[in-house]
Amino acid sequence: MMASKTPEGSLTNSSQSMSINTLADQVSSSLSFADPSSDGKTGNSKINEQGESGKSSTCRPSTSSDISDESTCSSFSSSINKPHKANDVRWEAIQAVRTKHGGLGLNHFRLLKRLGCGDIGTVHLAELNGTRCYFAMKVMDKTALASRKKLLRAQTEREILQCLDHPFLPTLYSHFETEKFSCLVMEFCPGGDLHTLRQRQPGKRFTEQAAKFYVAEVLLAMEYLHMLGIIYRDLKPENVLVRDDGHVMLSDFDLSLRCTVSLSIVRSANVGSEGLSKNSVSCSQQPACIQQPSCISMAPTSCFGPRFFSSKSKKDKKPKTENGNHQVTPLPELVAEPTGARSMSFVGTHEYLAPEIIKGEGHGSAVDWWTFGIFLYELLFGKTPFKGSGNRATLFNVVGQPLRFPESPVVSFAARDLIRSLLVKEPQHRLAYKRGATEIKQHPFFEGVNWALVRCASPPEIPKPVDLEALNPTPTVPAAASSSVRSDQSNYLEFDFF
């Protein structure tokens, strides 16, 4: 397996440079018109990099004291810095305990249930003592991390979580250390993950309408990550968790890559002009909502009656010009894609690996758009497109076999076209290679989606309430990520021939 190299990504062909955090906050806040309540994981085998990777930070530089300094973390993980969670009572509960006891530790939590086990830690459902506030706590054995050279990966995940403030990304409430463990206190999603939810659907696949809902929310989360210079590298249904309100949240950032990125605003072509791209639709103009506060004062039915797709009456339609084209004022497009990032790491899940990772050619942000295509394919068809008889066969299928669609179920041409545009083996020809999520949002598959109000849409399914108080506490904390819990060890492959 190849060791990773420190990537430096940049976006140099911008017409107007903007502050990363400022613009990311604008896009994130455009989804906060409603404030639905929001409260880990099974997994396929991952391929992990052999060594630790150096990563440039877009949030703040790492220091050696970060591993054990909770006060440093708490200054970043607070409701003040995360407006999407500003009214969350869990912030107040955490702060009350911290103020009363001078800090936060494992003894302040009651571990109720093991939710899942990943490569670097075990996730538990935990209750903050005496508060009825529930969290997902990721517990990592520091000795095991050090022996397996995973300390930097754990640190990178924590730093990424500290940076995030988005409706479809996790909230890190706190981080603390014990003599043996490193713990991340995050929000709990009682709806499980999309993999489990898909298994319960007829035919073990989602309808196209349901799939569109989920991938739209994932796309907005990925767009935000790329704005921050974060390449996710681990998108799959197991890592998309379902909140209690039915909306989703990405999880598991231990394979993510951090790089530098420049944000820019570029002028888009007039939608009524002859030079319009065939894949562009009216929703490409949606970023105007970021700049127009009037969007917030829409009629309540637009948000809470909720419709995912717009349905306009004849009198609501936009006026046409003399030649019959709609009058649409050219509006700026947000471009935030770390196109210059490069890594030689061999990481990911076999069925989701992009060809450039397998071939060891070095990869950048385009790998996320490949996995986005695989993700959509799996939601629609109930399986991934290149799965072979074994892991090795799967990898060779990804590199050498063409994309094929099954005869059943029947999906729309737009859905197949989007998947086909994303699953292009040459990354430079892949949809979203240059302009990221902006290109995908303009694809006809998403025609009619009001991107600013996705958060207000009705989810396809609302999880059944879970009686958390009836759960018995976990007697002991297991040695997270130790060899004793790595039951899928045989599924981990190392490749020295790519």
Swiss-Prot record:
The keyword Kinase applies. Belongs to the protein kinase superfamily. AGC Ser/Thr protein kinase family. Interacts (via C-terminal PIF domain) with PDPK1. Component of a complex made of PINs (e.g. PIN1 and PIN2), MAB4/MELs (e.g. NPY1/MAB4 and NPY5/MEL1) and AGC kinases (e.g. D6PK and PID) at the plasma membrane. Binds directly to NPY5/MEL1. It comes from Arabidopsis thaliana. GO terms for biological process: auxin-activated signaling pathway; gravitropism; phototropism; protein phosphorylation; regulation of establishment of cell polarity; root hair initiation. Its main location: membrane. This is Serine/threonine-protein kinase D6PK. It comes from the Eukaryota. Keywords: ATP-binding, Auxin signaling pathway, Cell membrane, Kinase, Lipid-binding, Membrane, Nucleotide-binding, Serine/threonine-protein kinase, Transferase. Protein kinase that regulates the auxin transport activity of PIN auxin efflux facilitators by direct phosphorylation. D6PK-mediated PIN phosphorylation promotes auxin transport in the hypocotyl and this is a prerequisite for PHOT1-dependent hypocotyl bending. Phosphorylates PIN1, PIN2, PIN3, PIN4 and PIN7 in vitro and PIN1 in vivo. Phosphorylates PIN proteins (e.g. PIN1 and PIN2), especially when NPY proteins (e.g. ATP binds at residues 115-123, 138. Residues 28-37, 62-80 have a biased composition (Low complexity). It is found in: Cell membrane. One of its GO terms (molecular function) is phosphatidylinositol-4-phosphate binding. It is an enzyme of class 2 (transferase). The lineage of its organism: Eukaryota, Viridiplantae, Streptophyta, Embryophyta, Tracheophyta. Pfam families: Pkinase. The activation loop within the kinase domain is the target of phosphorylation.
